[in-house]
Amino acid sequence: IGVRLVGSEMCIRDSGTIVFHWLTAFLVVGLFALAETWSFLPRGTPTRRLLQSLHISFGLAFAAVFVLRVIWRLCLGRRLPPASSGWLRVASTGVHGLLYLLMAVQIALGFLFRWAQGEPFAFFGLFNVPTLIAIDHEQRQFIGGLHDTVAWTIIILALLHALAALFHHYVLRDGVLRRMLASR
């Protein structure tokens, strides 16, 4: 449960928000690392296929975490007063909104790309994900290119987000980073 401390103390987010934030961060970075790693491997090799399979399975996990995160944020998560005002608040709100939008788009593109390949895909080998929409195989390259572009955009925005957190912590010393590191 989140609390708002008085005076110079910081606001602390609820545990669920913190868990969803860091789980999302680790999944996004991990998915990106898997994709970038397999791009250096020859097509059709067992290692490349394993990395792609892991990317798909963790991508499905990411989709579930993202949906749960949005539900949590809308229904249960504690809203705190903004840590900044003026242009910092506008920038923070804009980057957060854009990250959410891009993550939703990336998830949709991931499904579309797999469906365009016309091959079944599984969640850690436990079950196959059904094809819900028939996608023309010819659109695969276009969708794959968008998936790659959105991935890089998310990584760049996430890096800016992390740098902003460090700026708040070391320059402004306003407790913003500590709000996402601990819950009381």
Predicted regions and their residues:
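Alpha-helical transmembrane segments of multi-pass membrane proteins
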Residues: 28-39
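Membrane-interface helix termini and inter-helical loops of multi-pass transporters
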Residues: 39-49
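Membrane-helix interface/capping segments
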Residues: 68-88
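Hydrophobic alpha-helical transmembrane segments
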Residues: 136-157
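Hydrophobic alpha-helical membrane-insertion segments
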Residues: 95-115
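Alpha-helical transmembrane segments
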Residues: 51-65, 150, 155
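Juxtamembrane non-transmembrane "cap" segments at the membrane-aqueous interface
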Residues: 111-132
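Single conserved hydrophobic/aromatic residue that forms the stacking wall/gate
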Residues: 1-12
